[in-house]
Design a protein with these regions (language model features):
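Conserved RNase H-like, two-metal-ion catalytic cores of nucleic-acid enzymes
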Residues: 1-71, 81, 249-287
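Metal-dependent nucleotidyl/phosphoryl-transfer cores and adjacent nucleic-acid-binding surfaces
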Residues: 16-21, 27, 47-57, 72, ...
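Metal-dependent phosphoesterase core characteristic of DEDDh/y 3'-5' exonuclease domains
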Residues: 18-24, 28-59, 83-193, 361-405, ...
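Generic detection of long, well-ordered alpha-helical segments
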Residues: 69, 97, 175-178, 257, ...
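Well-ordered alpha-helical segments embedded in enzymatic catalytic cores
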Residues: 74-78
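Protein C-terminal end segments and domain termini
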Residues: 275-399
Length: 473
C-alpha cells in the first residue's frame, strides 16, 4: 500500500553536507491523509560539529535534550529504513530544498544508499511547499495567507497560526511542524483535482511527459524552442511566483538536468551589458524537483505582471536579432561541467565521486552486518579508499570512548581544522564552501549578543551554554 511519510528535521546549522540532523519526526499516513503511525528520533550532537547559535536559538533544542538521544549512525540506519519502506512517498515542507539533502548526506557518510528512497521499492519524494505556491497562485481562497509587513509569506509556522492549525507542541519543534504540515495538506487536499494534478509534478515520468507535450513552436533562425512558465517560491510575490522561461535543452554531461533561462530578466549577460554569456543564470531543473513547469497558455500567462510579459518580448527579440550569440550561450551551458574540488572533504564527495560501485556496496553491507566489536576489524579489510575513510569516521563519531587517543589521527586532524582560524585549514565542500568552525561560531555569537534584544530566560540559558561549548571546543 502506498503511504505518505510526512517528516521534518531540526539541524545544527544550514549546511546539509557538514551540519547534522538533531531531531527527525515523521507521521505516516494513507493517501487520504489518515494517520497510521508516528516516529521521532533525537540524535546526540557529534563531537566534530560546532553548533550554529542562530540555529539553536531558532529550534531551542538544549544540550540536555540531545544528550538523551542516540548516535548518528544508529539514527541513520533507523531513518533510512523508514524512508525506504516499500511504497513510501517521503515529503515535507521545503524538503526538496533543505531536509532531503540533509538526509542524503547523512546516509552517504554513514555508508547507506543516499538515493534509494527516491526510486527503489516503489518509493519516491514530494514537497508540499511548491504545491502550496501553486495553490497561492491559482486557488488563493483555499486558506488564509499570512503577511509580514504587507508582504505575503509562505512560512509554515505563520500559515499554521493564521489558519489555527491544531498541533501539540511549539513552532520549530520537528513533530509540531509535521502536524502543522498534515493539517495544511488536508486543506489543500479538499481541492482534490488540483491536489492530484500537483502530485504528478513529482513523478519523473509524468512530469517529463507533460513537458514533452508542450509544443516547441518559437522559432529562432532554424531552431525551435519551448516557451513555458515556471512557478517557484524563489521568484517572489512581486511576479506572483511565476517566470516566463525558454527551454535551452538537456545538459550534456548531466543527463538528468534540463536547462531553462528566465525571459523576464532586465539584463541577460552577453546581451547589452558588460558581462559574458558564461555569467547568465541558467536554471538547472531535475525531474520531480519541485520547479513547476506550465505551458504558456493565455489563462496562465495573464496571471504574470505586465512587466514580465514586456521583458519577455524584448528579450526574445534580442535572441532573434543576435541568434549566434544566443546559440553560443546555449552551447556553453549545455556543455558546462561543475569544477572538481581537488581537496574536497570525504563527507562532501558524494556528487564528485558518484554512486557507490557494486564492490563498494558489498563493503558497506559487510561493515553494517558486523557487530559493534568487530567493526574496527572489518575496516582494516576494506579495499575502497573512500569507504575506508568514511567507515573510520563512523567509528570515531559513534564508537569511540574514553581519552582523545581512542580516535584516529585523521579525526583529530579534522577537529584541529575546525579550531583553526587559518583559511588554508578550512574543510572544503563540493560548492567550494567550508565547514562551520569555532571561529565562525564565535563571530556569530558576538553578533547575536549585540543585536539580540530582550532574550527570555531560556534564550539566555541557551546563549550561555553555546558560549561555553564553542569556546571549549
Amino acid at each position: 500500500m502506498k503511504t505518505f511519510l510526512f517528516y521534518d528535521v531540526e539541524t545544527s546549522g544550514l549546511n546539509p553536507v557538514f551540519d547534522q540532523i538533531l531531531t527527525f519526526a515523521s507521521i505516516r499516513t494513507d493517501l487520504r491523509l489518515r494517520e497510521i503511525n508516528r516516529q521521532s528520533v533525537t540524535i546526540q550532537l557529534r563531537g566534530d560539529i560546532v553548533p550554529s547559535p542562530k540555529a539553536f536559538l531558532t529550534h531551542g533544542l538544549t544540550n540536555d535534550e540531545l544528550a538523551l538521544g542516540i548516535h548518528e549512525y544508529e539514527a541513520a540506519l533507523r531513518i533510512h529504513k523508514l524512508v525506504n519502506t516499500p511504497e513510501t512517498i517521503s515529503l515535507g515542507y521545503n524538503s526538496l530544498g533543505f531536509d532531503d539533502e540533509f538526509l542524503r548526506f547523512m546516509f552517504y557518510r554513514n555508508l547507506l544508499d543516499p538515493y534509494s528512497h527516491q526510486y527503489g521499492n516503489g518509493c519516491s519524494r514530494m514537497d508540499i511547499l511548491p504545491i502550496a505556491v501553486v495553490y497561492r497562485v491559482f486557488h488563493a481562497d483555499i486558506i488564509k495567507w499570512p503577511e509580514i509587513e504587507g508582504k505575503p509569506s509562505l512560512k509554515l509556522d505563520l500559515i499554521a497560526e493564521a489558519n489555527n492549525l491544531v498541533t501539540s507542541g511549539r513552532a520549530h519543534e520537528a513533530m509540531n511542524d509535521v502536524e502543522s504540515l498534515i493539517e495544511l495538506s488536508k486543506k489543500l487536499f479538499s481541492q482534490e483535482e488540483t491536489w492530484h494534478y500537483c502530485l504528478d509534478f513529482f513523478s519523473k515520468t509524468k512530469e517529463e511527459a507533460r513537458i514533452n507535450r508542450i509544443k516547441s513552436d518559437f522559432q529562432i533562425q532554424n531552431r525551435y524552442f519551448r516557451i513555458c512558465i515556471m512557478i517557484s517560491l524563489s521568484f517572489g510575490s512581486k511576479v506572483n511566483y511565476m517566470a516566463p522561461v525558454i527551454h535551452l535543452g538537456q545538459s550534456l554531461p548531466y543527463k538528468n538536468q534540463s536547462l531553462w533561462l528566465r525571459l523576464d530578466s532586465e539584463a541577460i549577460p552577453g546581451f547589452g551589458d558588460a558581462l559574458n554569456i558564461e555569467d547568465a543564470h541558467v536554471i538547472r531543473k531535475r525531474p520531480g524537483d519541485g520547479l513547476i513547469i506550465l505551458p504558456a497558455l493565455e489563462r496562465f500567462w495573464n496571471r504574470m505582471p505586465a512587466s514580465s510579459k514586456q521583458l519577455t518580448d524584448e528579450n526574445l527579440e534580442k535572441f532573434c536579432s543576435q541568434c549566434e550569440k544566443f546559440f553560443e550561450l546555449i552551447q556553453y551551458h549545455l556543455e558546462y561541467r561543475y569544477p572538481l574540488i581537488p581537496d574536497i572533504d570525504p563527507d562532501a564527495s558524494l556528487y564528485q565521486d558518484g554512486f557507490f560501485s557494486g564492490k563498494e556496496k558489498k563493503e558497506c553491507e559487510k561493515f553494517h552486518l558486523a557487530g559493534k566489536d568487530r567493526k574496527h576489524e572489518i575496516v582494516d579489510q576494506l579495499q575502497s579508499p573512500r569507504i575506508k575513510i568514511l567507515a573510520n569516521r563512523i567509528l570515531d563519531r559513534n564508537f569511540s570512548k574514553g581519552p582523545l587517543q581512542a580516535t584516529s589521527k585523521e579525526y583529530q586532524c579534522h577537529l584541529d581544522q575546525l579550531r583553526s582560524v587559518s583559511e588554508a585549514n578550512k574543510i572544503k565542500g563540493y560548492k567550494g564552501d567550508t565547514k562551520y568552525g569555532r571561529h565562525e561560531a564565535l563571530e556569530e555569537l558576538k553578533e547575536l549578543e549585540s543585536t539580540f534584544l530582550n532574550p527570555d530566560p531560556d534564550q539566555r540559558k541557551m546563549m550561555a551554554w553555546l558560549n561555553d561549548y564553542i569556546k571549549e571546543f
